Amino acid sequence: MKIIFENQDIIVVDKPAGLAVHPGVGTEEKTLVDFLLEKFPEIKTVGDVPEIRPGIVHRLDKETSGVMVVARNQKTFEYLKDLFKNRKIEKKYLALVFGTLKEKEGKVEGEMGRSKKDFRKQSLVRGKISVRKERYSLTHYAVKKEFEKYSLLEVSPKTGRMHQIRVHLHSIGHPIVGDKKYTFKAFKNISAPRMFLHASSLSFTGPDGEKYFFESEPPKEFGEIK
């Protein structure tokens, strides 16, 4: 784990793929939270559930790499939480997906919720917009580069539902390479060194009024695509 930036309010980290953000059921290895507590013990009382995820305002899946912001005090935690809730934080991701997209840019939106078939997965009803704001999801995407069997996308989620990007790209027929949970049978046996989803940048106005922009370079696996 790499610290990109720190001040009295925030810690910005570059999370590697394979590192869980916080402990969960069956998690025995060290997590991002464990490393943060060693270096920044003051965050142990910060957050909604500080005994499990101190300072954590947003999360990345274990298999996802990239930039994350962590709150260093409760006031900043509440401030950042409000920014995320009101979509005032700009997030961009890189995603390598199977196939060639007909539409080179577009959006996916709809209502998300827990799958009725598998409680461990999320599902999407595309195009369904209800009054339940907590379920609404929206993702913009654009093709950056095309390969023989894959496409590299820049993805901008406008909401923050669990597994949102993974579910949305799967829903349009282009699952993320290396994603074992949201894929099709035809791709399940195709080996990949990782799940190719990377949080590449984060931008927002801090509690001090400063405008911040943080980015994480794509991991080496993204440079080995053919």
Language-model region placement:
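RNA pseudouridine synthases
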Residues: 1-226
